[in-house]
Amino acid sequence: MAKAATSKKEASKVEAKKPAARLGAKKTVSKSEESVKTSQSVKNSPSRTGSSSPQKGGKKGAVGEIKQVIGAIVDVQFEGALPNILNALETDRLGSRLILEVAQHLGENTVRTIAMDTTDGLVRGQKVFDTGTQICVPVGEATLGRIMNVIGEPVDEVGPIVTTKTRSIHQKAPEYIEQSTESEILVTGIKVVDLLAPYSKGGKVGLFGGAGVGKTVLIMELINNIAKAHGGYSVFAGVGERTREGNDLYYEMIESRVNVNPKENDGSTKGSKCALVYGQMNEPPGARARVALSGLTIAENFRDEGQDVLFFVDNIFRFTQAGSEVSALLGRIPSAVGYQPTLATDMGALQERITSTKTGSITSVQAIYVPADDLTDPAPATSFAHLDATTVLSRSIAEKGIYPAVDPLDSFSRMLDPLVVGEEHYAVACQVQTILQRYKALQDIIAILGMDELSEEDKLLVGRARRIERFLSQPFHVAEAFTGSPGKLVSLEDTIKGFKGLCAGDYDDLPEAAFYMVGSIDEAIEKGKRLMAEASS
């Protein structure tokens, strides 16, 4: 009886020492249920004070204490069994809930964890509770129209995400036998993309570019064009980018009716098409290293329910960068250019999950920042192997004022195959690239000797190349406020027709300016006639 009374007292002490936030209402229904189960598990678990050697696999509700805090890395010591690798631990930080993810098992019953939020306010000796599971996020239609953080908590101040469905952010990639192998083009309405580097439905697309060449604007235009035409669900993962851009995107989605404004709909987001998961620049590296996985988990759930999902990531380089920061804090020896030694493994674990199955598809569009415009940098170079199409944004094209600043010669797609796109499309794309390649080769001669030294044939080719270059520009819907021009969505048929005529020389009589920032070729002809009439008057 005395022993039983003692154990009850010990259990009540453990209960009393739990953080206040743990007993409060959670932001998702599923989390509160998990919290109740965890507290019962702690209450009913036997005292482990007598155990000195770590047992295999810690039990849910095990209690440890903080031994060391180094930035985003927290060392926690347990008496008895250690939590499994990737388990989520929970503690109190200045009255709010802080999640730690187990990364390493050290000696002396200690685990090294990565914090999913800032560690300000943590102290040595503070109690930490093992949840017994990995980080789980809410999934399903309740997430649509909402902004969540890395652990699935809503940050849009619209109330809790009411769902009982949650899913671990660490999942295995689908088996090879489950994957779909069909090839189909995803038409974006952007001329340069659809003609020269078409996207694959259910494939992976990379937008490569340095700082300030238009990656985010292009992603926002793709969301606007595809999400509207496509009609399915989308998931946007903001990884280590500007908070302002995330805020703008949220309101633009409401304005373009992709999402429903909950403030005008009695707090409901029913009818929304896109879920947003943000881990922005100001977040610790732990959050930035995991937020892409959180977004992907939501997308995978929709795919497994039979949906065709669009998954946008801005920016995949920040995922690598966060992994590099975490790796250094964990004490791993850096690899090439200071990146983590597990760079290829980390990237592969994420990218292999972004795939289409026989149930549904995930079409992924990923912005990839290129440090110092160097495509051979290990971070962008590691991404190349996983992509079905690459859209390379060039600073030299942006300097000419041509937007989107897509490099027509560096961009590539495995879909540009006559068996997939058809003979006409393939032939026109090859003609355009041949003319632009010849123009690029002649630019040194033009710069040194001038146009007069070229042959008549080359002069004609240069004129066509300059018209093609300008016709590759296009006004965007999401940039209307900046350009003052209404956005244009161009069908694939109109795109092929326009470039076929340009290559054949059908529009050699029109001024070059007629082809700049227009949609279809008919608009260019109309603009050209207007310019010629103004010049002659």
Curated annotation (Swiss-Prot):
Claim: Cell membrane is one of the keywords in the record = yes
Q: Which domain of life is it from?
A: Bacteria
Checking Pfam families in the record gives: ATP-synt_ab, ATP-synt_ab_N, ATP-synt_VA_C
Basic and acidic residues composition-biased segments: 7-18
Q: Which reaction does it catalyse?
A: ATP + H2O + 4 H(+)(in) = ADP + phosphate + 5 H(+)(out)
Segments of skewed composition (Polar residues): 44-55
Please give the InterPro entries that the UniProt record associates with this protein. Answer: AAA+_ATPase, ATP-synt_VA_C, ATP_synth_F1_bsu, ATPase_a/bsu_AS, ATPase_alpha/beta_chains, ATPase_F1/V1/A1_a/bsu_N, ATPase_F1/V1/A1_a/bsu_N_sf, ATPase_F1/V1/A1_a/bsu_nucl-bd
For molecular function, the Gene Ontology terms on record are:
ATP binding; ATP hydrolysis activity; proton-transporting ATP synthase activity, rotational mechanism
Alphabetic keyword roster = ATP synthesis, ATP-binding, Cell inner membrane, Cell membrane, CF(1), Hydrogen ion transport, Ion transport, Membrane, Nucleotide-binding, Translocase, Transport
Q: Keyword S-adenosyl-L-methionine on this protein?
A: no
- Region (Disordered), start-end ranges: 1-61
> What name has this protein been given in UniProt?
ATP synthase subunit beta
Identify the taxonomic lineage of the organism of origin.
Bacteria, Pseudomonadati, Pseudomonadota, Alphaproteobacteria, Hyphomicrobiales
What gene does the UniProt entry assign to this protein?
A: atpD
